[in-house]
């Protein structure tokens, strides 16, 4: 029998006032439902906006549940649910709360400051149903089960919307997911404050890792059995309209949370390999993965210190704690498990690749080499920098001085260069 999905759950973690969230909600309520066979849509709003609650714990988003609001859309095929968090769960955990509570097997994740394309749900349904098509003899055209559909993402630029990201995107908004696959493979978002920003990456990496080792579950990319113009995803506003990027601490939040994500990914990979007997098979790939993430952590750590030392920025204590703890964890994983197998060329290649082919904010080390970082540590006043508390870190940063080229002027290489290039006498 040909498969026909019942409907799609759209999950949105909510914060901010209605002027922001209305656009997302209306983009869901105005979905094209299909001409002859309307698709059912469940919109699950997960209210994490505790600061916006009334004294009676009333949610601003209860407006979307009123009879007055229900007059604005097709309530036969669209249902709105509201879940109110009793404590902050932040973006990732709120998404997970939403899709676990959803009634349909398939779900889409959309942020409250994003919008879905008008035909997103109908296109996803068409692609999923097409995957399970049967011929006249009742035989499936495709084998296996469908875990997710990749879609396109669009962002708005100076000339309207433009093609932004296709395919293996790290943004969770770019896919429609099968909840059964997610649950079977223990794919989770980070928890606590690590769930607040930068949470997309570990979720997608875990999902893709499980997919790459599964012979039954598959993923397909748009376009699928259709023209190249099919647009099955979110219109996305990553810059001017992004609530998270309006946070003045956004960049340094990401420093610690990205490192927490790296640890979360590594731990998932290792647990998955152990569970499925893949430890020997994946050993070389894991060595490469841990080295990559530790090199990234090395540069991230340096950049954080430089940012504090050379600007007026005052980081949050929690951001420093998240950064130092998670960099320390990555360093320990690399040193304890893989370091004896790593050769000089591995390190040099990775340093180059992370520097030139990643989004890292590069800062040249004034403390020593990556080898020094792993084997000796970087010290100040007889204490490893990764063990400094917040106050000590601020004191240390006051001892640093960076020139216009981003070099720390007291570093050995800068001092050596100055000795070889003395300034000409002012009188000559």
Predicted regions and their residues:
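C-terminal subregions of glycosyltransferases and related glycan-biosynthesis enzymes
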Residues: 2, 227-428
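The conserved acidic donor/metal-binding loop of glycosyltransferases
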Residues: 111-115
């Amino acid at each position: 029998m040909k498969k026909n999905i019942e409907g799609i759950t759209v999950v949105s973690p909510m914060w901010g006032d209605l002027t922001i969230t209305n656009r997302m909600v209306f983009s869901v309520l105005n979905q094209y439902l299909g001409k002859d066979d309307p698709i059912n849509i469940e919109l699950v709003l997960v209210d994490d906006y505790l600061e916006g609650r009334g004294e009676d714990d009333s949610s601003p988003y209860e407006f979307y549940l009123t009879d007055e609001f229900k007059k604005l859309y097709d309530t036969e095929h669209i249902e709105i649910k509201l879940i109110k968090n009793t404590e902050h769960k932040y973006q990732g955990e709120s998404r997970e709360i939403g899709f676990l509570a959803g009634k349909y097997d398939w779900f889409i994740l959309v942020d409250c400051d994003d919008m879905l394309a008008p035909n997103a749900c109908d296109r996803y349904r068409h692609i999923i149903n097409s995957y399970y098509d049967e011929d006249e003899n009742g035989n499936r055209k495709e084998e296996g089960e469908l875990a997710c559909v990749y879609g396109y993402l669009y962002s708005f630029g100076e000339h309207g919307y433009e093609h932004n990201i296709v395919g293996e995107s790290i943004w969770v908004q770019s896919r429609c997911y099968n909840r059964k696959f997610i649950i079977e493979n223990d794919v989770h978002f980070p928890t606590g404050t690590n769930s607040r920003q930068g949470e997309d990456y570990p979720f997608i990496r875990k999902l893709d890792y499980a997919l790459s080792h599964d012979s039954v579950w598959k993923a397909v990319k748009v376009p699928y059995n259709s023209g190249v113009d099919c647009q099955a995803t979110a219109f996305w506003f990553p810059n001017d309209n992004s609530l998270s990027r309006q946070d003045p601490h956004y960049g340094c939040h990401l420093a610690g949370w990205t490192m927490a994500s790296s640890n979360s990914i590594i731990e998932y990979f290792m647990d998955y390999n152990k569970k499925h007997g893949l430890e020997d098979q994946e050993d070389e790939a894991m060595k490469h993965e841990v080295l990559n993430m530790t090199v990234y952590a090395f540069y991230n750590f340096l950049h954080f210190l430089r940012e504090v030392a050379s600007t007026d920025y005052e980081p949050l204590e929690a951001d420093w704690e998240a950064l130092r703890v998670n960099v320390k964890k990555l360093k320990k994983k690399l040193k304890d498990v893989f370091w004896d197998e790593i050769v000089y060329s591995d390190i040099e290649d990775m340093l180059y690749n992370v520097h030139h082919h990643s989004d890292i904010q590069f800062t040249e080390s004034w403390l020593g080499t990556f080898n020094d970082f792993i084997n000796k540590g970087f010290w100040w006043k007889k204490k490893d920098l990764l063990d400094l508390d917040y106050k000590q870190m601020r004191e240390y940063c006051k001892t640093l001085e960076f020139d216009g080229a981003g070099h720390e002027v007291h570093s050995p290489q800068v001092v050596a260069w100055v000795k070889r290039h003395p300034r000409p006498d002012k009188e000559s």
